[in-house]
């Protein structure tokens, strides 16, 4: 009888341990830090602005104008300050392709060099090294606009809709894919 209890106890321990060992290390589900209207899909980019900015929605054409410095003031007459991720970041590549209509970072750099030389643009976008830096910049600069992966948004900034769609909505176009 003692032997049966010992085998049963050992078997139970093996089952319990193997269940936790076989579970992936990243099995904990990551929950967005800021509640959005929809559940963002992995790879959705969120356009973020300073919390005081009253803008709720921008069209893709308006976003393009802001990111290319063709518009440099919000409707409140607040000066805009565009933030971009560093060259080579997948988020930056997606913004260049989907918002700016450019396939290479070099096209973006050339665009701003020409615009600055012809005095059409005074302020170039601010390049930031990480999503944390992007959020911090946008949270601290009242006219700032930037972007991060939707699952990285925190309550210090506000997500705006693009073409009346939020990250996670069906048909949302700003994705890394």
Give short role names for the model-derived ranges.
Residues 2-11:
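Bacterial N-terminal signal peptides that target proteins for export
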Residues 10-20:
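Bacterial N-terminal signal peptides
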Residues 22-27:
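Sec/Tat signal peptide C-region and signal peptidase I cleavage site
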Residues 28-177:
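Exported/periplasmic ABC-transporter solute-binding proteins
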